Amino acid sequence: NGQELRTGDIVLRCGSGLTSRAVLAADNGGSYSHVGIVVDSSGVMMIVHAVPGEHDFPNDFDRVKMDEAKTFFLTTRTKNGRILRYSDSIVAQKAAQAAYRLYKSGIIFDHEYDISDTTTLYCSELVEYAYKQAGILSITDGIRHDVNLPVFNYEQVILPSDFLHSSQLTTVSEF
């Protein structure tokens, strides 16, 4: 619901695709497989997120993109969702502005899931980095995971559920 969204809100969704299942497995059965951040684009609340496989046009590539909330939470992509909020709206707005700049700069999706390289970003890394640009050392309280699955083997990964467990965020809506 667009009226519930505020600039800087962190939105989580759980999808049913192959990538979603891999993320959930990496997260030991976590509830969410994807995360984005709400930005104000000319008065319209939009979601900036880094996502593989959701292309908008022929020859599109995996990248940081911006979607309407109804597109981000499409029932074909989403089983359930949640909206989290940071208490300081000024900081949240700065994080959203940073995310919007990253979207405008055409950052591509980080298939290496490398937290130390911000030239490419995956979904959780994008939101963490946006809040870091707003002065928050780690919106996920520094939680990192080493993931060792047959198709998903990475170190120091931030998972979508880490936002859910953050002491700095409050749930404002769940569906």
Question: What is each residue range found by the language model?
Answer:
Residues 1-4, 27-29:
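Short, surface-exposed secondary-structure edge patches
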Residues 82, 89, 93:
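A contiguous binding-surface segment within folded domains or other stable secondary-structure elements
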Residues 15, 39, 51, 73, ...:
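Sec/Tat-exported extracytoplasmic proteins
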